[in-house]
């Protein structure tokens, strides 16, 4: 009977494969050199609809093409975070020997996965002092970078290159090489398009699905397939039930052996389905020095996070779920499923996990060394406490909003957006973390009905009142984060007066009464710098829109990103701001400018509903962590 069940399952698999054969023929995972690849990569002998990046595997070292019929680059390494490091060997050889002549004809395709830097190749007669440069030996010219707009660049020619090409050395001297990395981020609907037999194509900055298996003429084929599967499933259930009755006594006698087999199959299931490494409990116990208190990074609502170093030398953050949390397995599986389907530079990377039948449930993340945004804004007795300049705060807001917009485009709601879940790397780049409460929102529904969960001070009042979770719930929480960034105040502070314990209530009250200056942190230069005053007031206005009680009045995260980038453009145009030293150069204020002038055209609700209503939920995430996932 077991053989019959296996054969029936295999038959169903063949039926499903045949239904999509016309769309997926020739598209499969493959090995190229020493690396394994899958979509969005494809081999030269595969159809172009199989991916976005073509790989040539005919030589020992694979090569990649960034655009159709474009130049071939050598692949140096591939990481689990969808980052691929490549090199232009001919140009690199030229640069290594000190020749820069090939740079003049160098160009890269327009790509959202590359950060570009502008180099200036200048005649030695136009030599620049005080800025980093790399000599172009014997060619009568030198190579410079970090030249500001206010410097004379006559006798120089600009060259666009990847940021990673310039490697600082001693003093002002730098090395230039032709090695760079691509961090590839695709929305979830692009992967679904590929899995449905379609071709995901890039059109400007968006992606379009062509030829997915959803045409009306497939109706009868899908009907026949559905009937076949339905009948076969019923037959399989009957056979499995009979098999269970016959072998019940055998299972009781050999329970311990079956338990070991189940653990093995669970590990294999995790490796195959989620495609992430499985760590043993002993390895992570050793990596964290037996979960030493000295390695403690933070305590959260669902677990404790420890610093560790695994066998291959990588620094990691190990999340140890609380044993008393009856939902820990659900949160464990939920976070793995979500993080393995997402790839974005501003989302924390999941390196692996233990088996779900392990002694303890442990999740292994990349280690983010610079703490959380909350640490830097108002943390006490933390190693990361320090002042964030206005330009840094605006950049943090944009990167966080971009990550949330990417989640929403992939039909995922974070549900626990807060400053303790926004981590900062060495360069103060954002990494959004903690997906234990995240939910998948099907594209054909407007909301999901679920009991409110989250952190007090950040929870959408409409979600709390109506039990309707939408992507606008994340928008509300992000509005609180925006207010924290401009005010340097925590989301909840019981030392404030009762009506202003929640920062959202305080912000709405100040903005409606044209008292934004009382809300904004004066250390940012609000009183002395016109540009800072204008931009912080504009962010306050955007936060006010995000905090509307009626979620239909709130913007989408995509609109929030657009508005924040527009504000950043104002910063770049402002002549009163010195970006290198973060110093303020005051100028006289125009007579028609001020927070009242900026906000006077906003249509504020007369009496917004306060979100300070007390409520109790055992499922909430307490705001107690300095490093919380």
Swiss-Prot record:
Keywords: ATP-binding, Cell membrane, Glycoprotein, Kinase, Membrane, Nucleotide-binding, Phosphoprotein, Receptor, Serine/threonine-protein kinase, Signal, Transferase, Transmembrane, Transmembrane helix. Residues 291-565 form the Protein kinase domain. The chain crosses the membrane at residues 226-246. ATP binds at residues 297-305, 319. It is found in: Cell membrane. It is a single-pass type I membrane protein. It catalyses: L-seryl-[protein] + ATP = O-phospho-L-seryl-[protein] + ADP + H(+); L-threonyl-[protein] + ATP = O-phospho-L-threonyl-[protein] + ADP + H(+). The modification Phosphoserine is found at residue 449. Its EC number is 2.7.11.1. Residues 1-19 form the signal peptide. One of its GO terms (cellular component) is plasma membrane. Belongs to the protein kinase superfamily. Ser/Thr protein kinase family. This is LEAF RUST 10 DISEASE-RESISTANCE LOCUS RECEPTOR-LIKE PROTEIN KINASE-like 1.1. It comes from Arabidopsis thaliana. The lineage of its organism: Eukaryota, Viridiplantae, Streptophyta, Embryophyta, Tracheophyta.
């Amino acid at each position: 009977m077991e053989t019959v069940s296996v054969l029936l399952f295999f038959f169903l698999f063949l039926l499903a494969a045949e239904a999509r054969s016309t769309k997926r023929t020739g598209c499969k995972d493959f090995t190229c050199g020493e690396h394994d690849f899958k979509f969005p990569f494809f081999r030269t002998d595969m159809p172009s609809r199989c991916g976005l990046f073509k790989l040539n595997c005919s030589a020992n070292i694979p090569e990649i093409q960034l655009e159709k019929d474009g130049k071939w680059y050598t692949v140096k390494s591939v990481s689990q975070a969808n980052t691929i490091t490549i090199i232009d060997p001919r140009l690199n050889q030229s640069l290594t020997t000190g020749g820069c002549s090939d740079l003049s004809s160098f160009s890269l395709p327009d790509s959202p996965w590359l950060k570009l830097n502008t180099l200036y190749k200048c005649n030695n007669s136009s030599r620049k002092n005080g800025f980093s440069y790399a000599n172009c030996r014997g060619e009568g010219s030198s190579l410079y970078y970090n030249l500001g707009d206010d410097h004379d660049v006559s006798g120089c020619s600009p060259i666009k290159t990847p940021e990673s090409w310039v490697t600082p050395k001693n003093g002002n001297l730098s090395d230039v090489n032709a090695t760079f990395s691509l961090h590839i981020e695709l929305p979830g609907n692009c992967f679904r398009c590929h899995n449905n037999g379609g071709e995901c194509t890039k059109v400007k900055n968006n992606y379009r699905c062509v030829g997915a298996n959803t045409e009306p003429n497939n109706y009868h084929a899908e009907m026949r397939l559905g009937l076949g599967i339905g009948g076969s499933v019923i037959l399989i259930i009957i056979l499995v039930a009979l098999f269970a009755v016959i072998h019940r006594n055998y299972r009781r006698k050999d329970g311990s052996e079956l338990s070991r087999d189940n653990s093995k199959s669970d590990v294999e299931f995790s490796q195959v389905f989620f495609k992430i490494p499985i760590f043993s409990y002993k390895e992570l116990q050793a990596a964290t020095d037996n979960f030493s208190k000295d390695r403690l990074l933070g305590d959260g609502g669902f677990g404790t996070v420890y610093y560790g170093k695994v066998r291959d030398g990588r620094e990691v953050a190990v999340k140890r779920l609380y044993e008393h949390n009856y939902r820990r397995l659900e949160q464990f599986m939920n976070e793995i499923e979500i993080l393995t389907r997402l790839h974005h530079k501003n989302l924390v990377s999941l390196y692996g996990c233990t088996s779900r039948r392990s002694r303890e449930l442990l999740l292994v993340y990349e280690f983010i060394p610079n703490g959380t945004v909350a640490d830097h804004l108002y943390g006490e007795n933390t190693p990361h406490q320090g002042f964030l300049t206005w330009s840094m705060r605006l950049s943090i807001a944009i990167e966080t909003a971009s990550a949330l917009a990417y989640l929403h485009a992939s039909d995922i709601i974070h549900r626990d957006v807060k400053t303790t879940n926004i981590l900062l790397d060495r360069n103060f780049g954002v990494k959004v973390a903690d997906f234990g409460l995240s939910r998948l929102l099907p594209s054909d529904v407007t909301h999901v009905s679920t009991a409110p969960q989250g952190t007090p001070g950040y929870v959408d009042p409409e979600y709390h009142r109506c039990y309707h979770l939408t992507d606008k719930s994340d928008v509300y929480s992000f509005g609180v984060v925006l207010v924290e960034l401009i005010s340097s105040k925590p989301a909840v502070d019981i030392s404030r007066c009762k009506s202003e314990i929640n920062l959202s209530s305080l912000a709405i009250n100040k903005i409606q009464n044209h008292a934004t200056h009382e809300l904004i942190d004066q250390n940012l230069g609000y009183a002395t710098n016109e540009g800072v005053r204008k931009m912080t007031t504009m962010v306050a206005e955007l936060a006010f829109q995000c905090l509307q009680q009626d979620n239909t009045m709130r913007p989408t995260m995509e609109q929030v990103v657009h508005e924040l980038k527009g504000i950043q453009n104002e910063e770049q145009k402002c002549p009163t701001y010195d970006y290198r030293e973060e110093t303020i150069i005051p100028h006289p204020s125009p007579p028609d400018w001020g927070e009242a002038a900026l906000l006077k055209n906003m249509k504020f609700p007369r009496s917004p509903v306060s979100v300070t209503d007390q409520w109790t939920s055992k499922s909430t995430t307490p705001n107690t962590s300095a490093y919380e996932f």
